[in-house]
Regions:
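Ser/Thr/Gly-rich flexible loops in soluble cytosolic domains mediating phosphotransfer, phosphorylation
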Residues: 80-101
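Structural beta-sheet core signal
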Residues: 6, 54, 85-89, 119
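N-terminal beta1-alpha1-beta2 submodule of the flavodoxin-like/Rossmannoid cofactor-binding fold
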Residues: 1-81, 112
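Short, solvent-exposed loop/turn segments at secondary-structure boundaries
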Residues: 16-19, 97-100, 132-134
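Charged helix-capping and loop-helix junction motifs
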Residues: 68-73, 99-105
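Internal catalytic-core helix/loop-beta-alpha segment
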Residues: 96, 107-108, 112-130
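A short, flexible beta-alpha/helix-coil linker loop
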Residues: 11-12, 90-94, 125-127
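Glycine-rich phosphate/pyrophosphate-binding loop and the adjoining helix
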Residues: 1, 121-141
């Protein structure tokens, strides 16, 4: 990977579990990375990035509405090469499979607009796991 843009797609951005997962990720990430809070909006220079990591909570079996303006801007960008899109999605349900519909939405978006697909991490019990004896599972390296 070259340069990574990490997009926090949570409506609670600075107070979210998505932010905490981003912090854990960055503790192990060795490359260059920038962060962007979708709820705050603002311009993005997509040409600077080889990879995008979308981190968001599950909202009604899909992506949060605050992430949609970012995706619309990304869809309208006609630059090349296209950054590879990765997803880390978490939910309060025990089963990480609950996140599958949201992942399919992002995969469909990538296919429709010509963005290469990267990796996916679907986390269940997202609200609970970070502050329990099982927290080691979320930040093992």
């Amino acid at each position: 990977m070259g340069r990574l843009l990490i997009v926090n797609g949570s409506p609670r951005a600075s107070r979210s579990n998505s932010r905490r997962y981003i912090e854990y990720f960055l503790q192990n990430w060795k490359g260059a990375a920038d962060q962007y809070a979708a709820v705050s909006g603002g311009p993005v220079s997509f040409e600077l990035y080889t990879d995008l990591l979308l981190v968001f909570p599950l909202y009604v079996d899909g992506v949060p509405a605050v992430l949609l303006p970012f995706l619309k801007t990304l869809a309208a960008w006609d630059g090349t090469p296209r950054p590879r899109v990765h997803v880390l999605v978490n939910c309060g349900f025990l089963e990480p499979e609950q996140n599958q519909v949201a992942v399919k939405m992002v995969r469909f978006f990538c296919k429709r607009y010509g963005f290469p697909w990267g990796m996916t991490l679907r986390i269940g019990s997202g609200e609970a796991i970070l502050d329990t004896p099982f927290a080691w599972f979320a930040h093992r390296g």
